Amino acid sequence: MKKPFNVIAIIGKPRDQQAIQTHRDLYHWLSSLGYQVFIDDRLSAILNDVPEEHFSGLVELGEKADLAIVVGGDGNMLGAARILSRFNTRVIGVNRGNLGFLTDLNPEDFQHSLKAVLDGAYIEEERFLLEAEIHRHGQVKSHNAALNEAVLHPGQVAHMIEFEVYIDESFAFSLRADGLIVSTPTGSTAYSLSGGGPILSPSLNAISLVPMFPHTLSSRPLVVDGNRRIKLLVSPDNRGTQEVSCDGQVSLPVSPGDEIHIYQSPNRLRLIHPKDYSYYHVLRNKLGWSSKLF
């Protein structure tokens, strides 16, 4: 019987000793099962019991592997997702972080659940990403992708920003606020949630726009079709510099008068879960929702 996966990548960053031990345990366990295993080269100086030829950079791991196991919290998953979404690589997470909305496996007993996944017992879903582009004088000055959200916000000094929002070139509204969160369904349980945005089911083809501390009593979050293109026109009268943050990890400088174009990326994150995965169980567990009464 053909195995669903043959080449497996282990991805993560050097953190505490427990997380490093999880990387080591995964490598030796998967190798003992006969898989070809490669590890994120950011761990090469620490995992000195792993042969040098088994380390690769993230792009090379995406090219080689048909399964990537991300060890850490959602932050590690976000960083890996922006790269792995370019490739035909399925991704699963071992939670060594805090909430872990995207990382399902328990690091203390991952073997049982992961073995079932390796045998083909898993749920697969595609999560879309956003592309964010900064346009200045008709040229794209910078761009990046975001799995959770792209956020327009002030630079180093906190102050209000004035901007206009267009959806498919149609004017929607203007705003004076601390910024705007443009979120995917995946990101709806992250920064967007903290800003009062709605929780969107991951399978929805939708994008939410969540104003940050708007200087008005009438502003509300807005959910639009996921195929819409969003343009933010930053007022030339703004003081100082602004930024667009992608997943809180990559910053794109914005100047007064710039245009910010945000749209759905053609790339997809192929996220997989154990067979018993339930999104609503995750919400109850992570957000402390009440259990069933009867």
Curated annotation (Swiss-Prot):
<dbReference type="InterPro" id="IPR002504">
    <property type="entry name" value="NADK"/>
</dbReference>
<comment type="similarity">
    <text>Belongs to the NAD kinase family.</text>
</comment>
<keyword id="KW-0520">NAD</keyword>
<dbReference type="GO" id="GO:0003951">
    <property type="term" value="F:NAD+ kinase activity"/>
</dbReference>
<feature type="binding site">
    <location>
        <begin position="189"/>
        <end position="194"/>
    </location>
    <ligand>
        <name>NAD(+)</name>
    </ligand>
</feature>
<dbReference type="Pfam" id="PF20143">
    <property type="entry name" value="NAD_kinase_C"/>
</dbReference>
<keyword id="KW-0521">NADP</keyword>
<dbReference type="GO" id="GO:0046872">
    <property type="term" value="F:metal ion binding"/>
</dbReference>
<dbReference type="InterPro" id="IPR017438">
    <property type="entry name" value="ATP-NAD_kinase_N"/>
</dbReference>
<dbReference type="GO" id="GO:0051287">
    <property type="term" value="F:NAD binding"/>
</dbReference>
<feature type="binding site">
    <location>
        <position position="176"/>
    </location>
    <ligand>
        <name>NAD(+)</name>
    </ligand>
</feature>
<dbReference type="GO" id="GO:0005524">
    <property type="term" value="F:ATP binding"/>
</dbReference>
<feature type="binding site">
    <location>
        <begin position="74"/>
        <end position="75"/>
    </location>
    <ligand>
        <name>NAD(+)</name>
    </ligand>
</feature>
<comment type="function">
    <text>Involved in the regulation of the intracellular balance of NAD and NADP, and is a key enzyme in the biosynthesis of NADP. Catalyzes specifically the phosphorylation on 2'-hydroxyl of the adenosine moiety of NAD to yield NADP.</text>
</comment>
<keyword id="KW-0067">ATP-binding</keyword>
<keyword id="KW-0963">Cytoplasm</keyword>
<keyword id="KW-0808">Transferase</keyword>
<keyword id="KW-0547">Nucleotide-binding</keyword>
<feature type="binding site">
    <location>
        <position position="159"/>
    </location>
    <ligand>
        <name>NAD(+)</name>
    </ligand>
</feature>
<feature type="binding site">
    <location>
        <position position="178"/>
    </location>
    <ligand>
        <name>NAD(+)</name>
    </ligand>
</feature>
<dbReference type="Pfam" id="PF01513">
    <property type="entry name" value="NAD_kinase"/>
</dbReference>
<feature type="binding site">
    <location>
        <begin position="148"/>
        <end position="149"/>
    </location>
    <ligand>
        <name>NAD(+)</name>
    </ligand>
</feature>
<dbReference type="GO" id="GO:0019674">
    <property type="term" value="P:NAD metabolic process"/>
</dbReference>
<dbReference type="GO" id="GO:0006741">
    <property type="term" value="P:NADP biosynthetic process"/>
</dbReference>
<feature type="active site" description="Proton acceptor">
    <location>
        <position position="74"/>
    </location>
</feature>
<protein>
    <recommendedName>
        <fullName>NAD kinase</fullName>
        <ecNumber>2.7.1.23</ecNumber>
    </recommendedName>
</protein>
<feature type="binding site">
    <location>
        <position position="249"/>
    </location>
    <ligand>
        <name>NAD(+)</name>
    </ligand>
</feature>
<keyword id="KW-0418">Kinase</keyword>
<dbReference type="InterPro" id="IPR016064">
    <property type="entry name" value="NAD/diacylglycerol_kinase_sf"/>
</dbReference>
<dbReference type="GO" id="GO:0005737">
    <property type="term" value="C:cytoplasm"/>
</dbReference>
<dbReference type="InterPro" id="IPR017437">
    <property type="entry name" value="ATP-NAD_kinase_PpnK-typ_C"/>
</dbReference>
